[in-house]
Curated annotation (Swiss-Prot):
It is found in: Endoplasmic reticulum membrane; Mitochondrion membrane. One of its GO terms (molecular function) is oxidoreductase activity, acting on the CH-OH group of donors, NAD or NADP as acceptor. The chain crosses the membrane at residues 292-309. GO terms for biological process: C21-steroid hormone metabolic process; steroid biosynthetic process. NAD(+) binds at residue 159. Keywords: Endoplasmic reticulum, Isomerase, Membrane, Mitochondrion, Multifunctional enzyme, NAD, Oxidoreductase, Steroidogenesis, Transmembrane, Transmembrane helix. InterPro entries: 3Beta_OHSteriod_DH/Estase (IPR002225), Lipid_A_modif_metabolic_enz (IPR050177), NAD(P)-bd_dom_sf (IPR036291). It catalyses: a 3beta-hydroxy-Delta(5)-steroid + NAD(+) = a 3-oxo-Delta(5)-steroid + NADH + H(+); a 3-oxo-Delta(5)-steroid = a 3-oxo-Delta(4)-steroid. The gene is HSD3B. Its EC number is 1.1.1.145, 5.3.3.1. Pathway: Lipid metabolism; steroid biosynthesis. This is 3 beta-hydroxysteroid dehydrogenase/Delta 5-->4-isomerase. It is a single-pass membrane protein.
């Protein structure tokens, strides 16, 4: 195949960075374009080092800026769209989440048509499928089950609408007479080095003598390692660029998991942190039913105060459901259509993530020393 180029939106983020690193190994790839609203100095430095291996262009811009998207897509062969706002407690605001996640995706699809980009891979979310109730038990869900979120909370709704737009865009005519081929990947909860959620959990625990919060002991999910999610994106772009494989992949969505054992979010945090002295809170936590109704009351208070004050509840019903559900999926369809097999075993993923957690502990101790001197 002739030389090709790939645009990764949200490429400076947790998942996006891993996708960029894997793209470096792709055959005949001439340029990687990385679009993000802002690049952290350490990310910019890391990407600068990679420019000796391949042409890597960093583009700072807004996903809602049509001119920015038009320029970013010009001459690209593939778009991997990871950029989104992940907000499960409504901290950002409904309008912003819906604009970035839905309108941003629609504008990017339109830019692909104008620039005649034939391949579009969308990073969706498990929350497009659920869970809808903490009482509902869903195990080894597959794509044929056609599970769908019933939540009107901005994050799951925005991801559902964005994925719908992407899959409906499959088959669109491009400006040059070609055809747009799309697919969507629905990863489970993603963990690994650099995870913003694990970072927040561990830092909060470090400020509380190493005691991890106990919010989700009733959950049972199959988390997925970031390196394996990135690998699934590479396999998806290979499939959509291959005329023989594209027929079975275009317009499809895929669950992405790996061989990480099903467990609660609390257990995952403890597994990754116990070596460094972290422990679970021994105090009894509220049962999910009581926590759910407390969340409902807080949402009512927030609504009643909204004309005069922007009260942000610490949690909501959607978050309580997410943290207390049994919800696991199968990745057999990705195996069949994409040839997906995890690049990293559970043991490898665990060790890499634990080492990173250890570095956070070290940084915390050094920061404390600096304060005391």
């Amino acid at each position: 195949m002739a030389g090709w180029s790939c645009l990764v939106t949200g490429g400076g983020g947790f998942l996006g960075q891993r996708i960029v690193h894997l793209l470096l190994e792709e055959k005949d790839l001439q340029e990687i374009r990385v679009l993000d609203k802002v690049f952290k100095p350490e990310v910019r430095e890391e990407f600068s080092k990679l420019q000796s291996k391949i042409k890597l262009t960093m583009l700072e811009g807004d996903i809602l800026d049509e001119q920015c998207l038009k320029g970013a897509c010009q001459g690209a062969s593939v778009v991997i769209h990871t950029a989104s706002i992940i907000d499960v407690v409504n901290a950002v605001g409904r309008e912003t989440v819906m604009k970035v996640n839905v309108k941003g995706t629609q504008l990017l699809l339109e830019a692909c048509v104008q620039a005649s980009v034939p391949v579009f891979i969308h990073t969706s979310s498990i929350e497009v499928a659920g869970p809808n109730s903490y009482r509902e038990v869903i195990q080894n869900a597959c794509e044929e089950d056609r599970l769908e979120t019933a939540w009107s909370a901005p994050y799951p709704l925005s991801k559902k609408l964005a994925e719908k737009a992407v899959l409906e865009a499959n088959g669109w005519a491009l400006q040059n007479g070609g055809t747009l081929h799309t697919c969507a990947l629905r990863p489970m909860y993603i963990y690994g080095e650099g995870s913003p959620f694990i970072f927040a959990h561990m830092n909060k625990a470090l400020e509380n003598n190493g005691v991890l919060t106990h919010n989700s002991k009733f959950s049972r999910v199959n988390p997925v390692y970031v390196g394996n999610v990135a690998w699934a994106h590479i396999l998806a772009l290979r499939a959509l660029r291959d005329p023989r494989k594209a027929l079975s992949v275009q317009g499809q969505f895929y669950y992405v998991a790996d061989d990480t054992p099903p467990q609660s979010y609390d257990d995952l945090n403890y597994t990754l942190g116990k070596e460094w002295g972290f422990c679970l809170d021994s105090r009894r936590s509220l049962p999910p039913s009581l926590r759910y109704w407390l969340a409902f009351l807080l949402e009512i208070v927030s609504f009643l105060l909204s004309p005069i004050y922007n009260y942000q509840p610490p949690f909501n019903r959607h978050f309580v459901t997410l943290c207390n559900s049994v919800f696991t999926v199968s990745y057999k369809k990705a195996q069949r259509d994409l040839g997906y097999e995890p690049l990293f075993t559970w043991e490898e993923a665990k060790q890499k993530t634990k080492a990173w957690v250890g570095s956070l502990v070290k940084q915390h101790k050094e920061a404390l020393k600096t304060k005391t001197h």
